[in-house]
Amino acid sequence: MKTKNICCIGAGFVGGPTMAVIALKCPEITINVVDINQDKIDAWNGDLSNLPVFEPGLADIISKVRNQNLFFSTNIDQSIDVAEMIFMAVNTPTKTSGKGRGYAADLTFVENCAKNIARVSKSDKIIIEKSTLPVRTAEKIKEILDSNNDLNINFDVLSNPEFLAEGTAINDLFKSDRVLIGGDNTKSGNIAVSNLVEIYSRWIPKDKILTTNVWSSELSKLVSNAMLAQRISSINSISALCEKTGAKVDEVSIAVGMDKRIGPSFLNSSIGFGGSCFKKDILNLVYISKHYGLDEVAEYWENVVRINDYQTNRFGEKIIEALNSDLNSKTISILGWAFKKDTNDSRESASISLAKKLLLNGAKLKIYDPMVSVYQIVYDIKNKISEDGLGEQEIDNLISNVTVCENFHSAIKNSNLVSLCTDWDEFKEINWKEAKSIMSLNPTLFDGRNLVDKHQLESLGYQVYIIGKP
């Protein structure tokens, strides 16, 4: 049976771009992206320059398919009812309470999604896990679907994890390294897999579409993110050693990456990885490992997160040390709030932890990011500070020391220290000679992304610290 209608539940960083590309490549399929958040849906239907997800190339695709065969709405039940295939792209945050708190994935949204699908469905459905989920979640989803529907409907649950890097998501969708589809080895399961393969094969070569059982697919997504994060933590641990020994981490990265067995990807030292996936998925892997009694395995992967936290904290301590441990009369500029360039996503960004540390030590902050909104930056800081149990008035007092700026120049004006935290291209083009004229006397530059030439800036009169360099 050919798929004529797709419903995607969840209009976020995964659902929006993925469905846009499928709509572009499969114009005969009607796709409804639904979400309970009316503001988010309004944004998807609004100005192309202000979509809720910023990805290079996304707005152009949306302009071609929106209201043609791609629709955004809050009509969840209606969209489920008419769809033959339903993608689940809802959030799976780390649990904040109960068993597994701080490690396990919170499957509340997934479970509610499954219950709603079961309640509404009047015909057979193919259900596709697009969210990153723990191993054997498909089994739980299947149980919920079957136990909450009285019409003897067949639900086939597939795992089809996304492997998108924010900032390059559209290119990743067009030119995927692989598309992974996990399904049950049953007659209906194989038909369901074939239906999804048919959709992707419209633009992805068949040899890059990998089919496995459901459990291998679910685990592969967690392991992929864990191993990418592991590489970042590995080179970040070496950056600390470089600073002590006189080696340069960028030179070490190049030398190591030229070994074809290792390769150069994810060997750029920074103040720490961020984003919605890496930390969450590693902690999920830790929890699963502990659940099965694999304590040594759990400890191994948890150390990846510990090194990441160490790197961010180390950067903050270096800043405090550079200002003689007295931040009360100091203004510090944070350039970059998104966890990486070419995205407006600030989830788990190292800038958030850095800002909290500096504020609690008395600094005044001026923050600039070309894509992250003022609202989001203030929200992130408040949310992070509240983890320490501070009262509302204490939090407001700290927030009063934060200024979110509209451009780079206003962010560094009269600043004592500038911290480069995100690798935005515009930060690579800064004229530091001109910048020095509007900063305070004897300015200091902390480069957490290896973007500047240390000797050049020192010749201009800056004190310079670059992560991973003596």
Language-model features, listed with the residues they occupy:
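Structural/interface elements that position substrates and couple domains in central-metabolism enzymes
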Residues: M1-P470
